[in-house]
UniProtKB/Swiss-Prot annotation:
Entries under PROSITE patterns matching the protein: CHAPERONINS_CPN10
Entry's localization field: Cytoplasm
Pfam families linked: Cpn10 (PF00166)
Matches recorded under Gene3D superfamilies: GroES chaperonin (2.30.33.40)
Protein name: Co-chaperonin GroES
Gene it is expressed from: groES
Cytoplasm is among the record's keywords: yes
Domain of life where this protein originates: Bacteria
Biological role stated in the UniProt entry: Together with the chaperonin GroEL, plays an essential role in assisting protein folding. The GroEL-GroES system forms a nano-cage that allows encapsulation of the non-native substrate proteins and provides a physical environment optimized to promote and accelerate protein folding. GroES binds to the apical surface of the GroEL ring, thereby capping the opening of the GroEL channel.
């Protein structure tokens, strides 16, 4: 992938959702839903604070994150794969093992 996000933006590859219910029923279409988890594939340089300082992002490439797919989320196809471009503030949590 040849794309570099700017400022406090993050590029995420959405993780696949489990397509079976707890009872073993295969879910399809909208019933399966879309995952709000993904892997960070690229990060911007950081956010410029009011005093002009650059604050590095808290997430890094390879982090598994839970995100809010709000109005600011942009879905982009890159090399025939779907990625989300979000601001770091759209990320709700980092999943730690």
């Amino acid at each position: 992938m040849n794309i570099r996000p700017l400022h406090d933006r993050v590029i995420i590859k959405r993780q696949e959702v489990e397509s079976k219910s707890a009872g073993g029923i295969v879910l399809t279409g909208s019933a399966a839903g879309k995952s709000t988890r993904g892997i960070v594939t690229a990060v911007g340089n950081g956010r410029v604070l009011d005093n002009g300082e650059l604050k590095a992002l808290d997430v890094k490439i390879g982090d598994t994150v839970i995100f809010s797919e709000g109005y600011g989320a942009k879905i982009e196809k890159i090399d025939n794969e779907e990625f989300l471009i979000l601001t770091e503030s759209d990320i709700l949590a980092v999943v730690e093992d």
